[in-house]
Amino acid sequence: MIKEVKIEEISSVMEIIADAKRLLKKQSSQWQNDYPNQKVLLDDISNQNLFGFFQDGLLIGIESLIIKEDENYKGITLGKWIKKPSQKDLVIHRIAVRNNYHNKKIGDQLIKFAIDYAKRKRIHSIKVDTHKKNIAMQKILLDNNFSFRGIIYLKREEEDNQRLAYELVI
């Protein structure tokens, strides 16, 4: 079941983030600085943007679903968005799954939830980005009919701030 994450679940959220950071460290510099940190995730929770995949009461995976124009997406290179970034985009950030639950299609279920969420909110463009070395995330996006749109550069300071940008128009 996927539902909104509550403040009482922040310790479980941070465990999932720690798992993701360890995994990503093996393949790239993604999430290796102080991001995402507890403040970012608490903001997601307080803004009702953080959703979790729960199984038998255990939080297994998370994603932030944010309806707004993302500043990082304004300067796309080597391609273009199908729909120009706007306040009516659904932007997916911070998808992560507990280590013991990889290869169980949890990421796919989170993406499918995001698509259904966008449809319920009458949003027609879903945007997301990932690191070029995050092959698993790229596969999940392509398997769910997202198309590669180009390259964006994150505004926050990070050693490797280049990201692959994907979009699904519904």
Where are these regions (language model features)?
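Conserved acyl-donor/pantetheine-binding loop and adjacent beta-alpha core of acyl/acetyltransferases
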Residues: 64-94, 102
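Conserved catalytic-core motifs of GNAT/GCN5-like acyltransferases
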Residues: 129, 142-162
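Conserved beta-strand-loop-alpha-helix junction that forms the acyl-donor binding cleft
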Residues: 102, 128-138
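Conserved GNAT acetyl-CoA-binding A-motif
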Residues: 111, 118-130
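Conserved beta-hairpin
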Residues: 49-67
